[in-house]
Design a protein with these regions (language model features):
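Bacterial N-terminal signal peptides that target proteins for export
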Residues: 2-14
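Polybasic, lysine/arginine-rich low-complexity segments
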Residues: 10, 26-27
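C-terminal motif of bacterial Sec signal peptides marking the signal peptidase cleavage site
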Residues: 22-24
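Short, contiguous, well-ordered secondary-structure segments
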Residues: 50-56, 89-92, 269-282
Length: 322
């Protein structure tokens, strides 16, 4: 689903707190100059998959371990591919979408619900089509929720709430997400950490959505509800194998019908992040960067953007000097 893979991690997780941010084929091909012979790798197959971990090197001796994450996972989705552990061990700091620990307090959920709530004189029913409202009511009944309570919230909030609830039913939780796993570990180990953006920035993205954009987000969520379980499993398998092509095709099959939402939640954020990552590389820093896997895929993804900046990008299994 679009929501689970592209929407900001902290916002998505906050909604799970109230009830909650991308198939084993081949890896996306690397450019000829960026590739190393497969036999040069120091990692051997271990049953955990190839993993979404890329090593980015600059001429200034900077190195980023660019790790694609899934923000919500199940216990059975572990262990992670060995590249994640190696990236943590060999990095000097952690870089996440948000600084470690930011937005984990109850105040975030409260602020989010306030932003997502209509004023007393209107409702969800009054702001979406009859078909959408009927579908929301049916979903609420199926999940044991009161439609009257949901009627108080804006379409964007309801969209994420529905997505979060569906993943919770599958046993997927942000407490098991890759981001949370390494964020908690870094804090316990005293490893420095920083974020690419802030919670307030993420929340304001939703506050800025037009009524049309909100309805598009809700309509897309409703259309995908019946396929959540199957699509989630496919997404996990593609992620485990580091198959960016499969991930991109899967995550954006429907999302690309809404280019303005894609730009807001993915493309525009990547363009801001790439400047920060580029600066780290030029300063010679060595960091583990954890972002939603969706941010790595496609021509507008971080991998291609880093290559265009002149950096060498290789899958970790093709790197000997890890």
């Amino acid at each position: 689903m679009f929501g689970s893979s592209v929407l900001p991690a902290r916002v998505f997780n906050a909604l799970l707190a109230l009830c909650l941010l991308l198939s084993a084929c081949r890896k996306e091909p690397l450019s000829e100059t960026a590739s190393a012979p497969a036999e040069a790798g120091i990692f051997i197959p271990d049953g955990a998959g190839d993993g979404c971990v890329w090593v980015v090197d600059s001429e200034q001796k900077g190195r980023l371990y660019l790790c694609g994450t899934i923000h919500i996972l199940r216990e059975g989705d572990y262990p992670l591919a060995p590249g994640y552990e190696a990236a943590y061990m060999f990095s000097e700091k952690l870089v996440l979408e948000l600084p470690p620990g930011e937005g984990s307090s109850p105040e975030l959920a409260k602020k989010m619900s306030q932003l997502g709530m209509f004023s007393a004189d209107t409702s969800l029913e009054a702001n979406v089509g009859a078909e959408a409202w009927t579908a929301v009511q049916a979903w609420a009944t199926r999940r044991g929720l009161e439609a009257s309570s949901i009627n108080r919230f804006r379409p964007w909030f309801v969209s994420i709430l529905m997505t979060a609830k569906e993943y919770a039913v599958l046993g997927a939780t942000p407490d098991l997400g890759v981001d949370k796993h390494f964020s908690d570990r870094a804090q316990a180990d005293g490893k420095p950490g920083e974020g690419l953006e802030t919670t307030d920035f993420q929340l304001q993205m939703f506050a800025a959505l037009t009524n049309r954009q909100q309805q598009e987000l809700l309509d897309q969520t409703l259309a995908e509800l019946s396929t959540v379980a199957g699509e989630y499993e496919k997404m996990i398998q593609a992620w485990k194998q580091g198959d960016l092509s499969a991930l991109h095709a899967m995550l954006f099959r429907e999302a690309e019908k809404h280019p303005d939402l894609m730009n807001l939640f993915l493309t525009a954020r990547n363009l801001v992040w790439i400047d920060k990552l580029d600066a780290m590389l030029h300063r010679g820093e060595k960091a583990m960067v954890l972002v939603g896997a969706a941010h790595l895929t496609g021509d507008a993804g971080l991998i291609e953007l880093l290559k265009k900046r002149g950096h060498r990008v290789r899958h970790y299994r093709e790197v000997q000097d890890f």
